[in-house]
Regions:
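Conserved SGNH/GDSL esterase-like catalytic core that processes O-acyl groups on lipids
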Residues: 2-5, 10-89
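Alpha-helical cap/lid subdomain in secreted, periplasmic
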Residues: 54-198
Length: 198
């Protein structure tokens, strides 16, 4: 099972001190536990926006891909990329991966209102903008034939309640944060892997 991770710093594992505690190895371990032989490659780049997926998709397709997990959107939000623009880039990336025969699972933009650097007075606005962005992404992914894992719905309350889920920079996940994200992503990834094997 050729598992490829694409997207931004979360997909790349920034914030964790050990590689095995990052998203790719955690998801690969879950798949191995269900009997899959997994070849993992991480094409994600810290700081990537949805527009940067083009190069990552080319790399994933060139290396061969059965399942692509895409985590993107946070940098689009922080750089004020309009939702329709980022969503179209994501749609195109998912569509290309699907045409290459891959199953695609997407974790949409996180709710950035839980980040400590966001002033309390702006949290409601940031949360609303994050939700709108994620909704645009969801529609784009479905149109392109991908699967959306509603990670933000599961982990946002966890990150809001537990500062230990953040790394020292208070922006990226810690090892514990990556475990929470992987647990939320895993059911969709495992379902797509089961379909691919069948």
């Amino acid at each position: 099972m050729r598992l490829r991770l694409l997207g931004d710093s979360i997909a790349a594992g920034v914030g964790s001190t050990r590689r095995e505690d990052t998203l790719g190895p955690l998801l690969a371990a879950r798949l191995r536990a269900t009997g899959h032989d997994v070849d993992l490659r991480v094409h994600a780049v810290p700081g990537a926006r949805s527009a940067d997926l083009r190069a990552q998709v080319r790399a994933a397709v060139a290396s061969g891909v059965d399942i692509a997990v895409v985590v993107v959107g946070a940098n689009d939000l922080t750089r004020f990329v309009p939702a329709h623009v980022g969503a179209q880039e994501l749609h195109d990336a998912v569509a290309k991966l699907r045409r290459a025969g891959a199953g695609v699972v997407v974790a949409t933009a996180p709710d950035l209102s839980v980040v400590a650097h966001v002033p309390p007075a702006l949290r409601d606005v940031v949360s609303a903008v994050s939700r709108d962005y994620a909704q645009a992404q969801l529609q784009a992914v479905i149109r392109a034939g991908g699967v959306v894992a509603h990670v933000e719905r599961v982990v946002t309350p966890q990150f809001a309640a537990d500062p230990a889920l953040f790394a020292a920079d208070r922006f990226h996940p810690s090892a514990a944060g990556y475990r929470a994200i992987a647990a939320a992503l895993a059911p969709a990834v495992e379902a797509v892997a089961a379909e691919h094997r069948a």
